[in-house]
Design a protein with these regions (language model features):
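Glycine-rich phosphate/nucleotide-binding loop
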Residues: 1, 136-224
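Structural signal for hydrophobic packing residues in well-ordered secondary-structure cores
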Residues: 1-5, 39-42, 81-88, 96, ...
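N-terminal glycine-rich phosphate/adenylate-binding segment common to multiple enzyme folds
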Residues: 1-63, 151
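Short acidic, glycine/serine/threonine-rich loops at helix termini
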Residues: 19-22, 47-52, 103-108, 136-139, ...
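Phosphate/ribose-phosphate-bearing ligand recognition and processing surfaces
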Residues: 50, 65, 78-86, 100, ...
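Glycine-rich phosphate/diphosphate-binding loop of Rossmann-like nucleotide-binding domains
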Residues: 57-130
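Active-site rim loops that border cofactor/substrate pockets in soluble metabolic enzymes
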Residues: 106-155, 187
Length: 225
């Protein structure tokens, strides 16, 4: 369905204790962590291009290719920039690793820099994925909108909600912003069959996904309710 945006909010909710405290040791307050992680969802590192040769022998070779197209990269960056532009902080962070992944990630950085020219009111920064994960833990309140490739977005979209205390209530939206195909909204962080039938499962993730769906479909009043 060409759901090329995976949108993953991470917000510290009332009644949830964040495992990451402030630098002075005091607990973080509800809403203090409030970020949106935008993951490229159709290409990147999760391509099916590759293969195996000489399987089972000492000469065995395994290869898998990363695919980044200008079309694919630009459309996720455009979505992320417009999202950042719509928020009070107007702050976009790009996840990269161009100091080690020498071809695809420098290209990603180039496209971020080019796209930024069209959004002069958005503050843009970039971090290599290793230090970015450290910053998620040390200062999650710094982040607003974070845009990443398929693999890096996959990592960050679990880490972000974990910093808010639980991944169990985190929502997810697989979006086709062009609306030429259906979009999909679901709480994606697994199930808990060990508590089935006990009436204690937290419905926040499902409710939040429903609210995101209503917002995407243009029912803002219903979303706010």
């Amino acid at each position: 369905f060409d759901q090329y945006i995976n949108l993953r909010p991470a917000r510290l909710m009332p009644g949830v204790i964040a495992p990451v405290v402030r630098r002075d040791g005091s607990p973080r307050l509800p809403g203090e962590i409030d970020m949106l992680i935008v993951r490229e969802n159709t290409e990147g590192e999760y391509s099916s291009i590759g293969g195996r040769m000489y399987e089972g022998t000492p000469r065995e070779i395994v290869m898998q290719e990363t695919v980044m197209s200008r079309y694919g990269v630009d459309r996720v960056l455009k979505f992320a920039f417009e999202l950042a532009q719509s928020r009070p902080k107007k702050h976009l962070t790009s996840a990269t690793k161009s100091n080690g992944i020498a071809i695809t990630m420098p290209y990603w950085d180039e496209r971020v820099a080019e796209m930024a020219k069209a959004y002069p009111d958005v503050k843009v920064d970039k971090f290599h994925i290793d230090i970015l994960t450290a910053h998620f833990v040390q200062r999650p309140d710094f982040f607003d909108v974070v845009v990443a490739s398929n693999l890096f977005g996959d990592i960050l979209s679990d880490l972000g909600p974990a910093c808010t205390g639980t991944i169990g209530i985190a929502p997810s939206a697989n979006l086709n912003p062009s609306r030429t195909m259906p979009s999909l909204f679901e709480p994606v962080h697994g199930s808990a069959p060990d508590i089935a039938g006990q009436g204690i499962a937290n419905p926040i993730g499902q409710i939040w996904c429903g609210a995101m769906m209503l917002d995407f479909l243009g029912y803002r009043a219903a979303h706010d309710a």
